[in-house]
């Protein structure tokens, strides 16, 4: 991940509805959530949610799958791990013991997404 890619990702999360959407999808895990359900839970019109889904998708934070007439969105956990790793690269001036809990969490996310 380079700086421009990180900025695109962070800008996508820098809006309240998109951040809430992303967090709900993280909580939902691999099952994901239907677009209509997310719009309803967040109290956002479906056409507005469509724009938010597009921004999150372009940032590679979520993916979608059409299931009949419904669209299910899922979080891209490997992208979450990638951006988190980018943000903490070189953490704590090389004193890795200070960052160990965070590094272990990232490793757990990466392991879960590669399985």
How should these model regions be labeled?
Residues 32, 37, 59, 71, ...:
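Hydrophobic alpha-helical segments
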Residues 4-45, 70-80:
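N-terminal helix-turn-helix DNA-binding core of bacterial DNA-binding proteins
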Residues 58-67, 74:
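Beta-hairpin "wing" of winged helix-turn-helix
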Residues 1-5, 26-27, 77, 81-115:
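Amphipathic alpha-helical dimerization/coiled-coil segments
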Residues 53-54:
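Short, hydrophobic-biased segments on the C-terminal half of alpha helices
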